[in-house]
UniProtKB/Swiss-Prot annotation:
This is Cytochrome c. GO terms for biological process: apoptotic process. The modification N6-succinyllysine is found at residues 56, 73. The lineage of its organism: Eukaryota, Metazoa, Chordata, Craniata, Vertebrata. It comes from Equus asinus. Binds 1 heme c group covalently per subunit. Keywords: Acetylation, Apoptosis, Electron transport, Heme, Iron, Metal-binding, Mitochondrion, Phosphoprotein, Respiratory chain, Transport. GO terms for molecular function: electron transfer activity; heme binding; metal ion binding.
Amino acid sequence: MGDVEKGKKIFVQKCAQCHTVEKGGKHKTGPNLHGLFGRKTGQAPGFSYTDANKNKGITWKEETLMEYLENPKKYIPGTKMIFAGIKKKTEREDLIAYLKKATNE
């Protein structure tokens, strides 16, 4: 899969403005991502999601994140995530490797 250290840099540059990853981390514009893998869309406790996110009904794992992070608004039309996506597959792989580690510590 990807490189965790490179993924951490991508997270800091592109995601940390709106998301936290640590256990007990607060929600920002986007939800805290701790425990992301294996959780269904729209399920972080205490975060106000759009119906689109709540109703998508998929479980977050490597494959679903690869598709979502490429083009979030295409994958979940109606999401309030205003991020355009990451077109480079290797960057998505690195970010997912980092998320897999950081959201499970």
